[in-house]
Swiss-Prot record:
Keywords: Cytoplasm, Magnesium, Metal-binding, Pantothenate biosynthesis, Transferase. The gene is panB. One of its GO terms (biological process) is pantothenate biosynthetic process. Belongs to the PanB family. Mg(2+) binds at residues 45, 84, 114. One of its GO terms (cellular component) is cytoplasm. Pathway: Cofactor biosynthesis; (R)-pantothenate biosynthesis; (R)-pantoate from 3-methyl-2-oxobutanoate: step 1/2. Its cofactor is Mg(2+). HAMAP family: PanB. This is 3-methyl-2-oxobutanoate hydroxymethyltransferase. It comes from the Bacteria. InterPro entries: Pantoate_hydroxy_MeTrfase, Pyrv/PenolPyrv_kinase-like_dom, Pyrv_kinase-like_dom_sf. It holds the Pfam family Pantoate_transf. The keyword Transferase applies.
Amino acid sequence: MKPTTISLLQKCKQEKKRFATITAYDYSFAKLFADEGINVMLVGDSLGMTIQGHDSTLPVTVEDIAYHTRAVRRGAPNCLLLSDLPFMAYATPEQACENAAIVMRAGANMVKIEGGAWLVDTVKMLTERAVPVCGHLGLTPQSVNIFGGYKIQGRGDAGQVLLDDALALEAAGAQLLVLECVPVELAKRVTEALSIPVIGIGAGNVTDGQILVMHDAFGITGGHIPKFAKNFLAEAGDMRAAVQQYMAEVESGVYPGEEHSFH
């Protein structure tokens, strides 16, 4: 199998073919996802909650991300692998470059960073130094203390700010964008305004791709279950069938449905 590249996702956007992506944190699940045909995976700082048991993503370190990136890369040698730069790992452009080097050496193809126009110089610096960047707007979990919790973003006037941020990140060189917990109407505007692929989570079925935290897709998240999550394992009965169902529902636009979306 040939390695999946960003140009393949670009082609999906142009051809209006929706694609499914998922978080992965270890060799075994990465291999399972790759075997079933998921070609894009994220080593998310969500591992702070799903793997380490913290109540936020803030305790996650660059070393944690690198460790899990190495494991996932072994399981899915040909996937397009995104890795998060965690909280305070990109406070300055120089710091972002140093930490991006660590996760890229561990096997990432691209780094994901949270934030808007303030990141323009960082995105430019990374891109100029051959580090592909995925932006992340909307509900950015590293900012949980600023937002005062996990809430829908981009309603009202904030929608235009988010769209401007998205355009600024693209102009700076970002090649992908994750849009989290925003109204469907805004997600549609952003997806249509950008030439780069947009991956949604809690952004309706109007984005180019979808991502889910694997624990949400399998219904093994304890406590609060996000509105946008769907337990594919409950319906499918086994993990491989659940992954197949997730992919099929994303590609057909069935998932996320109205019941998983915000307005």
